[in-house]
Amino acid sequence: MRNNKTPFLSAIFTASIRGYQRFFSAFTPSSCRFYPTCSNYALWLLYFESPLSAMGKIAIRILSCNPFCSGGIAYPVTRLKRPSLLQSHKDFNRNFKTITFWLVPTAKSRTTYYIIKV
């Protein structure tokens, strides 16, 4: 389910966001109006989506983070194909990995999911 189409571009964006979190955001007071923070929102989207579509959603999120917005809980939303039960059972037996994200279906459609980090 991870985005593997353009790993180089995703790695560049992810490294720049992690650098921002480590060197700039760590030294400023916490003032984010949303949960998850805009930088975590960006990292989660880059994990699941192509970098270009993720950057569009990230830009909208950053523009909505202003004094006139009330903020709140706003999880990123992504589109994914639901895996078949047989395929996921085969994958489960072969390569078991720890759960990092929950994908919670939205009420809008069967292919859009909220991304929630465990």
Curated annotation (Swiss-Prot):
Residue spans crossing the bilayer: none
Primary location: membrane
Cellular component, GO annotation: plasma membrane
Topology versus the membrane: Peripheral membrane protein
This protein's record includes keyword Nucleus: no
Keywords, alphabetical: Cell inner membrane, Cell membrane, Membrane
Pfam families per UniProt: YidD (PF01809)
InterPro entries, per the entry: Membr_insert_effic_factor_YidD
Domain of life according to the entry: Bacteria
Localization in the cell: Cell inner membrane
Task performed by this protein: Could be involved in insertion of integral membrane proteins into the membrane.
Family (UniProt): Belongs to the UPF0161 family.
Name this polypeptide is given: Putative membrane protein insertion efficiency factor
Species this protein is from: Helicobacter pylori (strain P12)
